[in-house]
Amino acid sequence: METVAVLGTGLVGNWIVRSLSSDGYKVIAIDADKSILSRLNDVADTIHGIVDEDLINSLDTDIFVNALPGRVGHRIRKILVEKGKKIADLAFTPEDPLEINQLAIDNDSILIYDVGVAPGLSNLLLKEANRRHGRLSIGRIRVGGNPTTKDDGWSYMAPFSPVDVIEEYTRPARIIRNGEVVTLPALSERIRFEISERGEMEAFLTDGLRSVLQTIDAEELIESTVRWPGHIDMYLKKKEELSEEDLVKAWSWDTNRPEFTWMEVYARGEGNSTWILDDNGDEKGSSMARTTGAITCAVVKFLIKEKGIYGVHPPENFGNDLLEMCLNEYSKNNIKINEIKN
């Protein structure tokens, strides 16, 4: 079996390491935090250190998962591409990964980016909707990971880097409206709606469409993040008085608190399709860790299987072949995604 190096072993990276190891792959786990890395000693070779060019050069593998925070993720993906690696890239960065497409081609490297739930699985479902229904009059993604119950405070805990969440709340949102890409303020177009068996939630625009702005044929295309009502009101009220460090502490993960990940992808063209993901997690990991990590693991297996493909690609470039592998990975991990027949 192939050896896979996983860069970053937070909640999602940890799940990826354990899943790939259980599937028989040799895994090398790398992180700067010794305390979280030590939890993986039983399933992987572990390396404690800062990910840099020297560390990458020391690793005897061509398959990498970039699960680093967005602020460092782009710098590392460039190093990996220059060295001709195959990369499943989970780092959500302000930089466009396609900037290094030619670099990847020149170095016989392949990088598939945005390999999570949204962006990631959402891209593949929209591509499938295009295949079924032609040009979409509307494509809509609503997605979020939240505690199962509301509280008197933030009603939130960050399932990935809290710093990335803050950037999500501040980066202007690019959407498609009337067939054109337009930019709107983050957190705008707030709407309350009901989730079956969950209750009333609130959705607001965030900049998660990324590659599908170019790859999906649609008259209108939007992505919204979902939170409990009151969360964004509190953020808007307190964002000037709280530092980044304050928010990181306030949104820290509580492993004992029940949580869920929910996503709806709705598409209408010549016909319509709706997919709903609703997951509570299990004893092996949080809902966001496993719903995200399973997509990343499917991409790793796709990269190992495919030969002679180079460049930087969003997942939807590989259409139904990759979608089937992702859905199979979900099924294997008992993650339910339901298509609603309309």
Short names for language-model regions:
Residues R132-N342:
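C-terminal catalytic/substrate-binding lobe primarily of soluble NAD(P)-dependent oxidoreductases
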Residues L20:
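Aromatic pocket-lining residues of Rossmann-like dinucleotide-binding sites
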Residues A91-L111:
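Rossmann-fold NAD(P)-binding glycine/threonine-rich loop
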Residues V12:
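Hydrophobic/small residue at the entry helix of a nucleotide-binding pocket
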Residues V27-L40:
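NAD(P)-binding Rossmann-fold cofactor-contacting core
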Residues I63-A67, I87-D89:
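N-terminal Rossmann-like NAD(P) cofactor-binding module of classical short-chain dehydrogenase/reductase
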Residues I79-P97:
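ADP-ribose/adenylate-binding Rossmann-like module
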Residues V4-G8:
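Conserved N-terminal Rossmann-fold NAD(P)-binding element of oxidoreductases
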